[in-house]
Amino acid sequence: MTEITLTAPKRLRGVIQVPGDKSISHRSVLLNAIATGSAHITNFLPGADCLSSVACVRSLGVTVEQPHERELIIHGVGLGGLRESTDVLDCGNSGTTLRLLAGILSGQPFFSVLSGDSSLRSRPQRRVVGPLRAMGAQIDGRADGDRAPLAIRGSTLRGGQYELTIASAQVKSALLLAALYADGPLTLGGRIDSRDHTERMLAAMGVEITVSPDRITLHPPTAATAPVALSLRVPGDPSSAAFWWVAAAIHPDAELVTPGVCLNPTRTGALDVLRAMGAEIEIMNERLEGSELVGDVVVRSSVLRGTTIAGSLIPRLIDEIPVLAVAAACADGETVIRDAQELRAKETDRITTVAAGLSALGVTVEPTIDGMVITGKPDQLTGATLHSYHDHRLAMAWAVAALVARGETTIVEPAAVVISYPDFWQTLAAIQEDV
């Protein structure tokens, strides 16, 4: 399927089981691979990115069974049990796989090479390579380690203190995983205000890690604090649910329910923004599942107004900005997005590609160095031909826009959704009603 053409339906209704959370699915594989014992993972996200993590740990000697598409049994080999791969470790399109594995492999007594597809090989890696080198890691790559392939010769790693300069969960996680192999405690400060699934999972596995608002300290494991396999049900992904939240809010006749979604406070920025814009949102049945807060989210047709998305909100919704930009285009008034320069290091330069797509839909939008200014107006979207550029979140954001655009909207390269939401197009068709 090289393109898909959509028109606006009269009504949206449905209860949508969104895929398992992408971040937690990755970590369930990578952390259990180096734990002791076997872990049973259910509601795993079988998207291309998470399957890259599975393929890589298998190449490193870990046995991973997959009885069903969304179920894994991971037989951990312990902190010292990984084996040198005889081939390049192919991370596909997955920056999470590459960066978290860079942390783990930096402390192994063998040589590894991490690479991926053309998109991943073009994305900046010095943000993780630099801090790992500061811990003593021996990593080389193109552009002095800023581009994959990355060659890693395992070495003795040092603990100490490191100040993070960007709020990146991937960088933070890579350092924490490297610290499992360090000669002393690692303390992280600075921009630690990104999603915290790694910290939660390590603690649940028995690792000695302390977290405060401005510091994270991990102590290298002893025999008593080495990670133990953690079985879990992966909660629904809020970054995937956000497409349905926005769809319901901007459509004139909609009610969509997304049950069992992760409501970890580091991941609920999109809900906070939509509420600030006036969206009618109801959260029911909040509960703890494992170490994560989960709930059922109901969103109904709403009258939205412009807002500002900036500062500490950004790390809590960085992946949802493409679809929040669609919400902003349908709101009354101006929406300002700033402090989001991290968007330029995603699968595409999402500041440029989102602004170009909105402009094609008839929206007045001004891209800036770290975000954009969107002039919103209800009922202003006009169908157009939009490119995903192989970026899964762009493809889905443009599909949401098509639900309220006049005329036909054609999306080129819609198959990009396989990265994080393989069933997206089937779900989109199922919730549309033309009564």
Curated annotation (Swiss-Prot):
Family (UniProt): Belongs to the EPSP synthase family.
Name assigned to this protein: 3-phosphoshikimate 1-carboxyvinyltransferase
Binding site for phosphoenolpyruvate: K22, G95, R123, Q170, R350, R393
Lineage, uppermost ranks: Bacteria, Bacillati, Chloroflexota, Chloroflexia, Chloroflexales
Superkingdom of source: Bacteria
UniProt-listed NCBIfam families: aroA
Gene that this polypeptide is encoded by: aroA
Quaternary organization: Monomer.
Organism of origin: Chloroflexus aggregans (strain MD-66 / DSM 9485)
Entry keyword set: Amino-acid biosynthesis, Aromatic amino acid biosynthesis, Cytoplasm, Transferase
